[in-house]
Amino acid sequence: MKEETALLATVTLLGVLLQAYFSLQVISARRTFHVSPPLTSGPPEFERVFRAQVNCSEYFPLFLATLWVAGIFFHEGAAALCGLFYLFARLRYFQGYARSAQHRLDPLYASARALWLLVAMAALGLLVHFLPGTLRAALFRWLQVLLPMA
């Protein structure tokens, strides 16, 4: 089991560390802009950092669920690579949003594409998993004809 999920576990841990980094950035922004908890509003510079962290936190459970389902039922390497791309896009999103609301858009779209790709891989993997054996074999034969290099 460990060997089969090591890549997914690594990407998960990197994601947790990234979430911790975002939280530390909010703490730093609170100190810089003198915004004490539980306040969530202040100068626009603080609010952008705060919103970026909250937005990233809101999507993290979706990311983790699709990463693991895609990795287990589709392909661990493909899911891990897509997960790394998602995390990198989220880092760029956070950094861009901290600068200005406009700078968040390109990384936001990139992370959304990565998340949708994970959803597609997870759904396809589950579909194939639940297909009856004869249909699954026919599908794989059809794919081998369609993609002879694979």
UniProtKB/Swiss-Prot annotation:
Keywords: Endoplasmic reticulum, Leukotriene biosynthesis, Lyase, Membrane, Nucleus, Phosphoprotein, Transferase, Transmembrane, Transmembrane helix
Induction of the gene: Up-regulated by all-trans retinoic acid.
Pfam families: MAPEG (PF01124)
A GO term for molecular function: glutathione transferase activity
Residues annotated as the enzyme's active site: 31 (proton donor), 104 (proton acceptor)
Ranges per topology, Lumenal: 28-48, 95-104
Keyword Repressor in record: no
Keyword Transferase set for record: yes
UniProt-annotated location(s): Nucleus outer membrane; Endoplasmic reticulum membrane; Nucleus membrane
GO cellular component: endoplasmic reticulum; endoplasmic reticulum membrane; nuclear envelope; nuclear membrane; nuclear outer membrane
Activity modulation: Inhibited by MK886.
Residue numbers bearing the Phosphoserine modification: 36
Biological pathway: Lipid metabolism; leukotriene C4 biosynthesis
An individual GO BP term: response to xenobiotic stimulus
Ranges facing Cytoplasmic side: 1-6, 70-73, 125-150
Post-translational modification: Phosphorylation at Ser-36 by RPS6KB1 inhibits the leukotriene-C4 synthase activity.
Superkingdom of origin organism: Eukaryota
Transmembrane segment boundaries: 7-27, 49-69, 74-94, 105-124
Residues the record lists as binding glutathione: 30, 51-55, 58-59, 93-97
EC number: 4.4.1.20, 2.5.1.-
Catalytic activity: leukotriene C4 = leukotriene A4 + glutathione; (13S,14S)-epoxy-(4Z,7Z,9E,11E,16Z,19Z)-docosahexaenoate + glutathione = (13R)-S-glutathionyl-(14S)-hydroxy-(4Z,7Z,9E,11E,16Z,19Z)-docosahexaenoate
Record membrane topology: Multi-pass membrane protein
Function description: Catalyzes the conjugation of leukotriene A4 with reduced glutathione (GSH) to form leukotriene C4 with high specificity. Can also catalyze the transfer of a glutathionyl group from glutathione (GSH) to 13(S),14(S)-epoxy-docosahexaenoic acid to form maresin conjugate in tissue regeneration 1 (MCTR1), a bioactive lipid mediator that possess potent anti-inflammatory and proresolving actions.
Subunit details: Homotrimer. Interacts with ALOX5AP and ALOX5.
Family: Belongs to the MAPEG family.
Protein name: Leukotriene C4 synthase
Organism: Rattus norvegicus (Rat)
Organism classification: Eukaryota, Metazoa, Chordata, Craniata, Vertebrata
Gene that encodes it: Ltc4s
